[in-house]
């Protein structure tokens, strides 16, 4: 999916009107989160794919600073990005080309910030406080609804290897839910399945809520 990001940045630079396509990646994640959590982030986000496939090769893979996960910081980033978005609208004008350029500027700048943070810390550092990711996490069902995908961890998990946490792009800890029939329902889980594939004892599996 990462090639979509690269094509977008090039095409929308020369044809500003194409910049409005980015609205799909602003609305899509939140709408999907209502039923599937941050599924979009792990499967359809071009920028997330870029971080996973490209930035990860050059990343230092350090721990993501805890403060960027805090509610306060995420609210600040949400307000800041939308404020900048509004300012860009004012500066570029409310025309198709102007709106497209606004979207393009936003995607370019935040992608660069994400790449820099990805090099310094972990590839998906940006994803921990991405405004759309934050909104998606907020609307994610806390108890899970019918059809809601989640990671289930068997009671047989001894939480010794913690391999699932080591491969999690969001640096979460799925092993914490070992034996819990509700499964791992962290709102920032992007449902990528890395933890399931990496589990050496195969005590993790992907399930869907039935109720």
Language model: regions and residue ranges:
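Non-ligating segments of multi-cofactor redox enzymes
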Residues: 1-211
């Amino acid at each position: 999916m990462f090639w979509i990001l690269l094509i977008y940045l090039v095409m929308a630079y020369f044809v500003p009107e194409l910049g409005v396509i980015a609205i799909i990646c602003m609305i899509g994640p939140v709408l999907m989160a209502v039923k599937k959590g941050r599924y979009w982030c792990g499967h359809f986000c071009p920028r997330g794919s870029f971080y996973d496939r490209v930035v990860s090769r050059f990343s230092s893979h350090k721990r993501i600073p805890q403060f960027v996960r805090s509610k306060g910081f995420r609210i600040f980033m949400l307000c800041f990005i939308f404020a900048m978005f509004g300012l860009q609208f004012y500066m570029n004008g409310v025309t198709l080309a102007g709106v497209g350029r606004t979207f393009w500027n936003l995607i370019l700048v935040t992608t660069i910030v994400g790449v820099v943070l990805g090099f310094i810390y972990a590839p998906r550092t940006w994803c921990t406080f991405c405004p759309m990711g934050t909104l998606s996490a907020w609307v994610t069902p806390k108890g899970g609804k019918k059809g809601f995908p989640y990671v289930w961890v068997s009671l047989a998990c001894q939480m010794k290897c913690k391999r699932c946490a080591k491969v999690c792009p969001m640096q979460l800890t799925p092993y914490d839910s070992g034996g819990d029939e509700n499964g791992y329902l962290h709102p920032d889980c992007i449902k990528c399945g890395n933890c399931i594939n990496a589990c050496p004892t195969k005590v993790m599996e992907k399930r869907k809520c039935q109720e």
